[in-house]
Regions:
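Non-catalytic accessory regions
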Residues: 204, 210-212, 218-222
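Long, low-complexity, charged/polar intrinsically disordered regions
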Residues: 3-193, 198-200, 209, 215-216
C-alpha cells in the first residue's frame, strides 16, 4: 500500500512536539511566576491599614499567598519534572501542559485587583509571559496525546485561532519525509517508537505518539 504525507504537516507536528517548543512554554511560565511573586512582594510591603476590614475574599495577601501562588508554584514544579523527563527522551510527559491550561480556572476565582496600584509595565509584562506560556501549552495539548487534521496544519496554519498567533519561521523547502509501513501501533497497544504516525483508516489524520520505558505510559488509545 502506498503512503504519502504532506511535509508541512509533518514539519509542524515535529515542531509542536519538540523539546525546544516545550522549553519555550516552560521558560515563559517560569518568567510569569517569578514576575508575579515579585509583584506580590511589592504589594505585601505596602498593605493598606484597613485591609482586614475587607471581606475575606478580598484580602489578597492571604488568598494569593496561601492558595494562588502555592498552586502556581506546584504547577511549575511539575513542569520542571516533566522538562527533565522530556530532556531524556520521554515525550509522554508533554501531557503535563494541561496543568497550565487549568490555571485559568483557579486564577478566575481570585481577584487580581491588588495589582491595580502596582507598576503598570511590570504587571503587563507579567501577564504577557503567562499569555505566551498558555499559547504554547494549548498547541502542545492539541498535539499530544491527541491528533491533528492535516488540513488544519497545511491550510489553516498560522492564521487559525487554534494556533494562538504562534507563528514559526517555516523553511523555504521542507525535509523529505518517508513513511515506514512496518511500524504500526494498534489501539490500546504500547507505542514502541516515538514519532509521527498517520491513520490508516483516515488519511487526513496525523498524530504524534510517544514511547516510554515507564509502565503504563505511552499507550495509544484511539
Amino acid at each position: 500500500m502506498c503512503y504519502s504525507v504532506n511535509p508541512k504537516a509533518v514539519y509542524l507536528l515535529e515542531e509542536f512536539s519538540s523539546f525546544a517548543f516545550f522549553e519555550n512554554m516552560r521558560n515563559n511560565y517560569g518568567l510569569f511566576l517569578d514576575s508575579l511573586e515579585k509583584l506580590f512582594e511589592i504589594y505585601v510591603h505596602n498593605l493598606t491599614y484597613d485591609l482586614r476590614s475587607l471581606p475575606y475574599p478580598e484580602q489578597a495577601d492571604i488568598q494569593w499567598r496561601e492558595t494562588v501562588l502555592l498552586n502556581l508554584r506546584n504547577t511549575m514544579d511539575r513542569i520542571e519534572s516533566a522538562y527533565a523527563k522530556i530532556k531524556t527522551g520521554d515525550f509522554t510527559y508533554l501531557r503535563c501542559t494541561g496543568e497550565i491550561r487549568s490555571n485559568d480556572k483557579g486564577l478566575s476565582e481570585f481577584s487580581p485587583h491588588w495589582m491595580d496600584d502596582l507598576p503598570t509595565d511590570k504587571v503587563k509584562q507579567c501577564w504577557d509571559y503567562y499569555s505566551i506560556a498558555k499559547s504554547y501549552a494549548s498547541i502542545i495539548s492539541n498535539t499530544y496525546p491527541t491528533y491533528w487534521n492535516i488540513d488544519e496544519l497545511v491550510i489553516d496554519y498560522p492564521e487559525a485561532d487554534i494556533f494562538h498567533e504562534i507563528n514559526l519561521v517555516l523553511p523555504d523547502s521542507y525535509p523529505i519525509y518517508r513513511v515506514n509501513p512496518e511500524i504500526i501501533v494498534k489501539s490500546n497497544e504500547n507505542v514502541g517508537k516515538t514519532g509521527i504516525y498517520i491513520c490508516e483508516e483516515d488519511r487526513n489524520r496525523i498524530e504524534f505518539m510517544a514511547a516510554s520505558e515507564e509502565e503504563g505510559r505511552g499507550v495509544e488509545v484511539l
